[in-house]
């Protein structure tokens, strides 16, 4: 068999953490009663006019700056025209011709220590569609427009990735960066971060691209990795058998670990984009851009280096802690109180992560650091009590289990 390599590009949709929708004042809160967060604008009623949410522009530009993009200081919105039941306007407001961010990149470190730069073609703003709910028993479908108009950014990479490992490293870097900005919680399971994988294979050493497919319905990093491996093998098998790879969109079934064709890209409709006549072009001034640059936080790589230098943490500890913005907040606040950085790190990486794994096993879903509710002050108090020999390690772990589960104050436990 010939030696093949895989060529991968990603389209990553990120739901922004604004309180209201992109073009109206309806709430973006997740989980409300169906159609309870709607108005004439986000349900496409005739005569309703959109008003741009400034926070969306701020978040989109901030993500662009954090990913080394050039910010388009004069950009605009376009209409993408298509008919579908979850799209009440019969068009989606997006950005085709002048996206807000272009020509960026992120640097990732792979497991063997090598570094790779993955280019970003563009980042654009757009609105989400509604959600269809199918009742197979009754034979009817319902539509919930609560999600219609929720603000998204789409981050489009260049086809620079050559393995599932590189894809996961890129997505992890994006997720961490966006979470540090506070622009999104990036929960794949809840759909606030979604990745579509564009993949083709070619003979190693070739400069020509093969026929690509797009794979959707990937709601975890593990599912993305499995889908990439399966699609790579499928395409190689077709080529080896002398058959043609069809350019198409495929849907991944993670339970059965296979994908099936949804629609052919060759038959894709013309969306007939044109500038949205109801929205004026956006001008981002030099002053506003400078303000956004000044507000950029300390990101993972810088924070990791500081933890090693300032607190004397091992590189492994610093890597684990800075993977989550929540971990860094707990670490820094608890350390400021008890002045025991290594012990705080040990408690986060030991007992905290152990209890998180137990919670994940109980619920059948990943328990994320962002869900932690206990106060750093409580952790600092436990560490101080052990240090003063007022309690032993076994008692400390028992107390921490109550703090973890119930967010109780250590003082209220009568120690």
Regions found by a protein language model. Give the residues of each.
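Basic, nucleic-acid-interacting segments
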Residues: 1-297, 315, 336-340
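Long, charged, helix-rich clamp/arm modules that form nucleic acid-engaging surfaces
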Residues: 243-415
């Amino acid at each position: 068999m010939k030696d093949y390599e895989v060529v991968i590009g990603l389209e990553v949709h990120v739901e922004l953490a604004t309180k209201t929708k992109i073009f109206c004042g309806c709430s973006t809160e997740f989980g409300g009663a169906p159609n309870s967060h709607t108005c004439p604008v986000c349900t496409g009623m005739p005569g309703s006019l959109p008003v741009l949410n400034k926070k969306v522009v701020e978040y989109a530009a901030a993500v662009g700056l954090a990913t080394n993009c050039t910010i388009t200081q004069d950009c605009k919105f376009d209409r993408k025209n298509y008919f579908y039941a979850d799209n009440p306007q019969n068009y989606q407001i997006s950005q085709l011709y002048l996206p807000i961010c272009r020509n960026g990149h992120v640097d990732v470190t792979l497991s063997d220590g090598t570094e790779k730069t993955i280019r970003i073609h563009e980042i654009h703003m757009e609105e989400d569609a509604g959600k269809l709910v199918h009742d197979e028993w009754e034979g009817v479908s319902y539509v919930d427009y609560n999600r219609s108009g929720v603000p998204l950014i789409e981050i489009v990479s260049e086809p620079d990735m050559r393995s599932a490992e590189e894809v996961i490293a890129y997505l992890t870097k994006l997720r961490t960066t966006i979470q540090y900005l506070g622009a999104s919680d990036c929960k794949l399971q809840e759909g606030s971060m979604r990745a579509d994988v564009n993949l083709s294979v070619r003979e190693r050493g070739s400069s020509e691209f093969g026929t690509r497919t797009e794979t959707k319905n990937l709601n975890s990093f593990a599912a993305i990795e499995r889908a990439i491996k399966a699609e790579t093998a499928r395409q190689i098998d077709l080529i080896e058998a002398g058959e043609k790879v069809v350019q198409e969109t495929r849907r991944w079934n993670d339970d059965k670990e296979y994908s099936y064709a949804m629609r052919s890209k060759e038959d894709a409709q013309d969306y007939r984009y044109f500038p949205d006549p109801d929205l004026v072009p956006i001008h981002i001034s030099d002053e506003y851009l400078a303000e956004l640059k000044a507000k950029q936080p300390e990101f993972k790589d810088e924070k990791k280096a500081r933890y090693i230098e300032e607190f004397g943490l091992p590189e492994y500890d610093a890597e684990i802690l800075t993977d989550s913005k929540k971990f860094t907040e707990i670490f820094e606040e608890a350390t400021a109180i008890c002045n025991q950085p290594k012990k705080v790190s040990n408690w986060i990486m030991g007992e905290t992560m152990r209890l998180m794994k137990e919670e994940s096993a109980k619920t059948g879903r990943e328990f994320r650091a962002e869900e932690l509710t206990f106060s750093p002050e409580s952790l600092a108090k436990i560490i101080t009590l052990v240090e003063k020999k007022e309690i032993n390690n076994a008692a400390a772990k028992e107390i921490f289990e109550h703090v973890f589960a119930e967010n109780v104050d250590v003082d209220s436990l009568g120690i």
